[in-house]
Regions:
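Flexible gly/pro-rich beta->alpha loop and the following alpha-helix that scaffold active-site loops
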Residues: 19-85
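Acyltransferase
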Residues: 183-241
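Short N-terminal binding/cap micro-motifs at the start of the first secondary-structure element
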Residues: 12-16
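Pocket-forming structural segment of enzyme catalytic cores
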Residues: 99-186
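Extreme N-terminal starter segment of soluble prokaryotic enzymes
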Residues: 1-4
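Cofactor-binding loop segments of dinucleotide-utilizing enzymes, especially the Rossmann-like FAD-
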Residues: 6-8, 33, 90
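Catalytic nucleophile loop
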Residues: 78-102
Length: 241
């Protein structure tokens, strides 16, 4: 299978999801948008599109003009080609906009290892049906998707007290995930050096929050990585259908 990954900062790649697909012999084409790389014109040659997180926000089209072409590419891939898509964090928000929603400020920001609650529709979802009723996930976001209620093809699969659309699916082939299942053991340290992420962490949890977050992630990382493996395996199945 041929995967396309749209990335917004080099250290935020598909993580363990990437490790699983490469170990299985699939190909991965990475487009580093923040470094000026262009999205391929023939998107239909790819079996799936991944869209990762980043320190920018969806409304920052003036500062990051490539966001405009990225949104168009996601729309082409999901709405016109109807091919499998998986968006994490910023990628989730970009999908939400493409599907007619808005991206709004979270109140409060969600940063840390926090609970996600599965919703009823997850039981019949082919990709996320493995998740338990409540589980822990790494969150690091100040914006979230809203306003998808009028899209009859969107299902809410996971929520938190702050964020309704923690996981949502579109027609059971395109998915947004606001949190991070794809993390490696080095992820928190890697992200903590990004100024925007560091500032958000300290504003939410205090200047000494990093060691506590690392401990919380370490306590859950084996479960998170096993869940990411199941996500990868289920996502691969819909590519084969």
């Amino acid at each position: 299978m041929k995967f396309l990954s749209l990335q917004h900062i080099a250290i935020e790649d598909p993580g363990t999801f990437k490790d699983f697909l490469l170990d299985d012999g699939h190909s991965l084409t990475t487009i580093q948008l923040d470094e000026g790389e262009n999205i391929p014109s023939n998107l239909d040659e790819f079996d799936a599109m991944l869209c990762m997180g980043g320190p920018m926000d969806t409304h920052m089209e003036q500062e990051y003009p490539w966001l405009v072409s990225e949104k168009k590419a996601i729309g082409e891939y999901v709405l016109n080609l109807e091919k499998p898509f998986l968006g994490f964090c910023l990628g989730c928000q970009l999908l939400g906009e493409v599907l007619g929603g808005q991206v709004v400020k979270s109140n409060p920001s969600e940063i840390g290892v926090l609970d996600i609650h599965s919703q009823e529709d997850i039981k019949i979802d082919p990709v996320f049906n493995f998740l338990p009723h409540t589980y822990k996930a790494l969150q690091w976001h100040s914006y979230e998707v809203a306003g998808l209620e009028n899209n009859k093809n969107v299902s809410v699969l996971g929520s938190s007290p702050t964020t309704k659309y923690q996981i949502f699916g579109y027609k059971k082939f395109a998915y947004g995930i606001q949190f991070h299942l794809e993390i490696r053991s080095t992820t928190v340290d890697d992200w903590a050096v990004v100024p925007e992420y560091k500032n958000a962490l300290e504003q939410s949890l205090g200047s000494e929050a990093l060691p506590e977050m690392k401990n919380a992630v370490n306590a859950e990382i084996s479960t998170m990585q096993e869940q990411c493996k199941m996500l990868y395996q289920n996502f691969l199945k819909i590519l084969s259908d």
